[in-house]
């Protein structure tokens, strides 16, 4: 839902207010939706594998809060670790060892890589959405740069 109200809707509204045609409005809506989702996935990754300093007070709180992020759902789909991940997510723990164990499982199951690849795919879809639509060249370049920034924040 965040991608819809923070990305898709504002860009579509801006296109409407700016006098955009239906093709431009839809392209910017799609761009906003895809980049908004990519941004959220990357934000979830930063919460897990960034540094405590970079994530500030929210480091690994998604685990403590039991959030079913894309990373967590992917890890839960692995039968080898399902019960352990479910137990950690359901516990409300803020124990650093337990949080580290969850991240270790997320890495072992390929869930972190899966989520990052998914975010990159969403970014590619976002860029494709505006590729053949008439836009101001400076605006297009800004949109493309923003899309890249959203998924490169971890690097």
What do the predicted segments below correspond to?
Residues 1-155:
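All-alpha prenyltransferase/terpene-synthase fold signal
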């Amino acid at each position: 839902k965040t991608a819809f109200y923070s990305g898709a809707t504002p860009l579509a509204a801006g296109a409407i207010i700016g006098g955009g045609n239906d093709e431009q409005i839809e392209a910017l809506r799609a761009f906003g939706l895809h980049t908004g989702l990519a941004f959220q996935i990357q934000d979830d990754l930063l919460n897990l594998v960034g540094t405590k300093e970079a994530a500030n007070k929210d480091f690994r709180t998604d685990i403590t809060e039991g959030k079913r992020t894309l990373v967590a759902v992917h890890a839960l789909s692995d039968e080898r670790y399902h019960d352990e991940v479910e137990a950690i997510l359901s516990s409300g723990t803020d124990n650093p060892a337990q949080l580290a164990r969850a991240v270790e499982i997320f890495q072992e199951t390929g869930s972190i890589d899966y989520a990052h690849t998914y975010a990159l795919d969403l970014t590619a879809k976002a860029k494709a959405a505006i590729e053949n639509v008439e836009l101001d060249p400076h605006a297009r370049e800004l949109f493309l740069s923003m899309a890249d920034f959203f998924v490169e924040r971890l690097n």
